[in-house]
């Protein structure tokens, strides 16, 4: 039986080609680890990033520091998603990569438009740092103060002596209020003072929406006032 020497010639097979099948066009280009990621990997990245962004919106911290941390995480995740999407679209031609990029860009455009609109209404860049969507703006002629609110209620309590607790973000210290405005994503209302009350030597003023109709007023005054 005759044997040909060609049967014993060695053939070099690159690891990338063995574990990562490539098309004829891709074979002419240098191997890239991104080409070896299956489409399921892109789908998992898209779903995971979408869920993370939704969880950030559902999570509603009560403190100012918690909202700042939430904003930092949101912008960091958005930047990561943008870089990941662009990187995948440039190095691959998968439909899911383009879908991820479109999702992130759309999300960023809508969020930026919403924050710009709120910033213009509030007259401050605070909406870009604090992700809440309800604010109280107080003007005294010379200066103004913007306070983010955890709730969408119109009620606002002014307390001259009680220290500001960041958990509430309702207390502002001034004795010459000229205008008090409640601003949210959907409405803007002028608040007027209706009554004063004293608790433990601390004088407070209750503000409610300006209205021609009767406004229900319920005041509970514990040692620490919460609205």
UniProtKB/Swiss-Prot annotation:
Residue ranges occupied by any CoV 3a-like viroporin TM domain in the UniProt entry: 27-130
Annotated compartments: Host membrane
Transmembrane segments annotated in the record for this chain: 39-59, 71-91, 93-113
Gene Ontology CC: host cell membrane; membrane
Keyword vocabulary terms for this entry: Host membrane, Membrane, Transmembrane, Transmembrane helix
All copies of domain CoV 3a-like viroporin CD, residue ranges: 134-191
CDD domains: MERS-CoV-like_ORF5 (cd21645)
Topological category with respect to the lipid bilayer: Multi-pass membrane protein
InterPro entries reported in the protein's UniProt record: a/bCoV_VIROPORIN_3A-like_CD (IPR046446), a/bCoV_VIROPORIN_3A-like_TM (IPR046445), MERS-CoV-like_ORF5 (IPR044323)
Keyword Transmembrane helix: yes
Name assigned to this protein: Non-structural protein 3d
Organism: Bat coronavirus HKU4
């Amino acid at each position: 039986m005759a044997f040909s020497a060609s049967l014993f010639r060695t053939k070099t097979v690159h690891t990338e080609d063995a574990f990562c099948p490539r098309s004829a066009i891709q074979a002419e280009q240098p191997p890239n680890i991104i080409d070896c990621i299956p489409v399921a990997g892109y789908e998992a990245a898209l779903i995971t990033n979408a869920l993370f962004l939704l969880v950030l919106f559902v999570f509603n911290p009560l403190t100012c520091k918690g909202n700042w941390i939430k904003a930092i995480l949101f912008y960091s995740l958005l930047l990561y998603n943008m870089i990941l999407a662009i990187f995948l679209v440039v190095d691959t031609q998968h439909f899911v990569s383009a879908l991820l990029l479109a999702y992130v860009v759309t999300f960023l455009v809508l969020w930026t438009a919403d924050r710009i609109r709120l910033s213009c209404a509030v007259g401050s860049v605070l909406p870009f740092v604090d992700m809440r969507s309800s604010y109280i703006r107080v003007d005294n002629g010379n200066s103004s103060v913007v306070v983010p609110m955890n709730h969408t209620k119109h009620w606002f309590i002014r307390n001259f002596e009680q220290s500001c607790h960041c958990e509430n973000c309702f207390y502002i210290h001034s004795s010459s209020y000229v205008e008090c405005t409640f601003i949210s994503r959907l409405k803007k209302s002028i608040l007027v003072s209706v009554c004063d009350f004293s608790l433990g030597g601390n004088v407070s003023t209750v503000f409610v929406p300006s209205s021609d109709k009767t406004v229900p007023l319920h005041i509970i005054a514990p040692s620490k006032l919460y609205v």
